[in-house]
Amino acid sequence: ASLAPSEMCIRDSAWTLLDVSAIAPYRPINFDDLGADILGLDLGLLGGPQLAALVFRDTRMFRRLDALDPVHTGKGARKLETPISSGLAGGVGPLVDHLAALAGGESGSRRKRLRTSMDALSAYLEELRADLYSFLSTLPAVHILGVTGEAAAGASDDRLPRLTFAVKGVPAETVYKRLFDNGLVTTLAPQTPLLTEMGVEEIGGAVTVALGPFNTYHDVEHLIRVVASLA
């Protein structure tokens, strides 16, 4: 019988490395839930400094890694450190404090406040996400990539509050400009092999919209009205 990737890692004493930069702005991150040993995180995508980090499940893992710093060759994390700007590093703490304060909690350790805040943020954004997907999918001229059409067959319902869509017969730049003129900032989806395979170029491109902690139900309704005026 075939083995799942995680089972192969356990059998061969290998480690699983996951880049969680895409989900970290929306959900609390837990090693056990993800089945990972090392997590990669781009702090810039969280609104922080342009730094990235690798987070290890257990400090004993450092013993198996070669040193990057010839001066520090011990068993700890110091041997893996590379020089970074102190100014950039100084922005990490305030970023965490900001995320920990989103839910308004002021008591408990920063770790506890961060967990409480991210749990609340995840629940709130999930409600906004459900409305965004539900209302946008009711517009007959709108195609949500990976959600409607053949490519969505068998797709998971566990989604982030971010989607890419196209409006039939309307170039993506026109959609983008109409949204921007109405106070809605989105992004033109870049050309990638995956999007090309999904037929994005054939329909005139697509637009990506992502929700954040300061978005409201009114924002979702406003976006739907503007898109409906095009569709």
Task: State the predicted function of each range.
Residues 15-17, 38, 162, 185, ...:
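Structural preference for beta-strand elements that scaffold enzyme active sites
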Residues 14-46:
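Conserved PLP phosphate-binding loop immediately N-terminal to the Schiff-base lysine helix
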Residues 1-10:
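Single conserved hydrophobic/aromatic residue that forms the stacking wall/gate
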Residues 176-187, 193-231:
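PLP-dependent enzyme catalytic core of the Aspartate aminotransferase-like
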Residues 45-124:
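Active-site C-terminal subdomain of aminotransferase-like
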